Amino acid sequence: QRQMCIRDRVKDRLILIPRIYTNKPRTTGDGYKGMLHQPDPNSSPDMLRGLIAIRKMHMKVIAETGFSCADEMLYPENHHYLSDMLSYVAVGARSVENQLHRLTASGLDLPVGMKNPTSGDLSVMMNSITAAQHPHTFVYSNWEVQSKGNPLAHAILRGSSNKYGRTIPNYHYEDIKILCELYAKSGLKNPAVVIDTNHSNSGKQWDEQPRIAKEILHSTRHSDDILHLVKGLMIESYIEDGNQKPDGGVYGKSITDACIGWDKTERLIYELADLR
């Protein structure tokens, strides 16, 4: 609803797509896994109630704001519960090498962003995009299906971690130029990248996101190739700054990844619009 209030003010320069993630991949498998698993984060998992809850939430957003949202395809077999309501899908860093994620992405009729893996190997991401852009025959939900290929499959840069667990960003000018070169050699359709300003790109320093976002737009001013390749930014934002445990009790504060709050988000949206 807050984004809706400023959408019309920036619509000639920016397209806003709310990022509503209903599943949460966990590095160790421990912790809150999102509304799909636990519609009530303080109760036991209930995936039937979770499926109903995530669909109702996306429907409510459309009904009250007109926004169709982005979600992560953590479980390919569950995508059809939301396929009629989403405008964007992301395949995460831990899923991007998975065959079923790639093949399912090839059958979707909306943009699908493929993140670079946590290792940072861009060839893995590019191979995933290639697979998603080609037609396939495969088994999905116990049916043999055929896909036509998804020409809107594209890259998401989210940073990586080295063998010592240190984060390595890949949002800088030089990183995007390398991706431009990979795309030029690939022959892929509709070259595009969305850049994640959090995760390993921020070193999980959530409050660095505004600076990172503005640096990316600065890079687009110094290279036509980058200007044409960068289609968007993925920003983790909510109502309050930071995050809390599921039983923290602060309304509007994330119970998963730390986010920038609404005041910073609103300011950043206007600043990005002015830079366009």
Where in this protein do the model-derived segments appear?
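Short, small-residue-biased leader/transition segments that mark boundaries at the very start
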Residues: 1-6
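Conserved, mostly hydrophobic/aromatic
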Residues: 195, 261
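Active-site-facing alpha/beta catalytic cores
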Residues: 7-178, 199-200, 204-215, 219, ...
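Mid-to-C-terminal alpha-helical segments outside catalytic/metal-binding sites
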Residues: 262-267, 276
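Redox- and metal-dependent alpha/beta enzyme cores, enriched for Fe-S-associated oxidoreductases
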Residues: 179-184
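Short helix/strand-capping connector loops at secondary-structure junctions
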Residues: 244-256
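Extended serine/threonine-enriched, polar tracts that run as long, contiguous segments within proteins
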Residues: 190-191
